[in-house]
Amino acid sequence: MTTHKHRRTEKNLCFKQYYKWILCFILTLYFFASFFVDHDQDHRSSTSISKHLLTNHKPKLFASRAMFESKIHDHKLGFTSQQPNIKTDVFNNLKIYVYDLPSKFNKDWLANDRCTNHLFAAEVALHKAFLSLEGDVRTEDPYEADFFFVPVYVSCNFSTINGFPAIGHARSLINDAIKLVSTQYPFWNRTSGSDHVFTATHDFGSCFHTMEDRAIADGVPIFLRNSIILQTFGVTFNHPCQEVENVVIPPYISPESLHKTQKNIPVTKERDIWVFFRGKMELHPKNISGRFYSKRVRTNIWRSYGGDRRFYLQRQRFAGYQSEIARSVFCLCPLGWAPWSPRLVESVALGCVPVIIADGIRLPFPSTVRWPDISLTVAERDVGKLGDILEHVAATNLSVIQRNLEDPSVRRALMFNVPSREGDATWQVLEALSKKLNRSVRRSNSFL
């Protein structure tokens, strides 16, 4: 009996050992199979990428877990990726080709540092941002492009008399660039330039004149009338200087200067200026040319509120004026020679409620920046009532407007970053261009 039990116990032990051996073998086989499958997939993926890089010279982005984890890590540390990952499906598979023009059209002008920092510098920032685009938006193959960007800087010819940009050379410089691309490439001639994009970051856009009457008389040059113009000028009524396909863009304000201003402002600092304006305010608005600066609006502001302690009005220049904007509740943005003003961007970026005094102005990127929610509009004829209007707003919905101004996406949409970042001004330009793809030869040919 004992012997029989002993044999049965030995048999059970052998069975258990045999079962464990089988289980270990199966698990080992599974892990080895998984390893070789993964290794083979990685090898094939690596081979595929290598073939792609050898056969296709256009830059592409390949996501990896390491890249993803590094981006999360960078975000936690407060850093952002140095290159934007912009995929074409965000903009209806939009593709842009940037002409590589001789340096006399763009880079040579950068010898003057002001060229990259003044209020007209969006022409430079956009060029740099387009060149920085990673992913699939910028193409190095012009035959697969929807649009062609022609980078000509015309705002960097600063006057030795008053320091302001002189743009009398703009028409001839752009015309020379068009002659160049139309003779060396086939793309301009096939559409008469309708799929070509230019910048005109001046008072009256592609009319290229600082005085409105002269701008209207000259109009948009014939050689640009079929193209797309990215311009700071825009009005809601018919105007000769926007009788061309156009996208209204914000004036350029250096992101670095704004970051520096924000960094130097104490978090607990209260806004101790109620209404702020610093800039040109003529006591006698009719200048030597016989024209009235700002349609007398700034003169009327000075005459009505120059002695009002609620209004901090300054006529002299001050390098640290952004810190004054950051201390203010309301920031006046009256027209100058043209309706638009860099104060719009600075006010939004620094959390001061913009008070827009420019009848009929068309503002940039209205689908993203809900201007009625973050600003006030006062008619030019109502400047004399400005104090009462602002008192009423302060007593009713000021806190709502200020809360809307805190939305970071609003501020981001008005900034030109290099490289471009998701949601910024360059991103908004790409979004606007993606809605004009009916001009693309590549798209029309795909339906033939």
Swiss-Prot record:
<dbReference type="GO" id="GO:0010417">
    <property type="term" value="P:glucuronoxylan biosynthetic process"/>
</dbReference>
<feature type="glycosylation site" description="N-linked (GlcNAc...) asparagine">
    <location>
        <position position="157"/>
    </location>
</feature>
<feature type="transmembrane region" description="Helical; Signal-anchor for type II membrane protein">
    <location>
        <begin position="17"/>
        <end position="37"/>
    </location>
</feature>
<keyword id="KW-1133">Transmembrane helix</keyword>
<dbReference type="GO" id="GO:0009834">
    <property type="term" value="P:plant-type secondary cell wall biogenesis"/>
</dbReference>
<dbReference type="Pfam" id="PF03016">
    <property type="entry name" value="Exostosin_GT47"/>
</dbReference>
<keyword id="KW-0333">Golgi apparatus</keyword>
<keyword id="KW-0961">Cell wall biogenesis/degradation</keyword>
<dbReference type="GO" id="GO:0005794">
    <property type="term" value="C:Golgi apparatus"/>
</dbReference>
<keyword id="KW-0735">Signal-anchor</keyword>
<feature type="glycosylation site" description="N-linked (GlcNAc...) asparagine">
    <location>
        <position position="438"/>
    </location>
</feature>
<dbReference type="GO" id="GO:0071555">
    <property type="term" value="P:cell wall organization"/>
</dbReference>
<keyword id="KW-0472">Membrane</keyword>
<dbReference type="InterPro" id="IPR004263">
    <property type="entry name" value="Exostosin"/>
</dbReference>
<feature type="topological domain" description="Lumenal">
    <location>
        <begin position="38"/>
        <end position="448"/>
    </location>
</feature>
<keyword id="KW-0325">Glycoprotein</keyword>
<keyword id="KW-0328">Glycosyltransferase</keyword>
<dbReference type="InterPro" id="IPR040911">
    <property type="entry name" value="Exostosin_GT47"/>
</dbReference>
<feature type="glycosylation site" description="N-linked (GlcNAc...) asparagine">
    <location>
        <position position="287"/>
    </location>
</feature>
<comment type="function">
    <text>Involved in the synthesis of the hemicellulose glucuronoxylan, a major component of secondary cell walls. Probably involved in the synthesis of the glycosyl sequence at the glucuronoxylan reducing end.</text>
</comment>
<dbReference type="GO" id="GO:0015020">
    <property type="term" value="F:glucuronosyltransferase activity"/>
</dbReference>
<keyword id="KW-0812">Transmembrane</keyword>
<feature type="glycosylation site" description="N-linked (GlcNAc...) asparagine">
    <location>
        <position position="189"/>
    </location>
</feature>
<dbReference type="GO" id="GO:0000139">
    <property type="term" value="C:Golgi membrane"/>
</dbReference>
<feature type="glycosylation site" description="N-linked (GlcNAc...) asparagine">
    <location>
        <position position="397"/>
    </location>
</feature>
<feature type="topological domain" description="Cytoplasmic">
    <location>
        <begin position="1"/>
        <end position="16"/>
    </location>
</feature>
<protein>
    <recommendedName>
        <fullName>Probable glucuronoxylan glucuronosyltransferase IRX7</fullName>
        <ecNumber>2.4.1.-</ecNumber>
    </recommendedName>
</protein>
<comment type="similarity">
    <text>Belongs to the glycosyltransferase 47 family.</text>
</comment>
<keyword id="KW-0808">Transferase</keyword>
<dbReference type="GO" id="GO:0006486">
    <property type="term" value="P:protein glycosylation"/>
</dbReference>
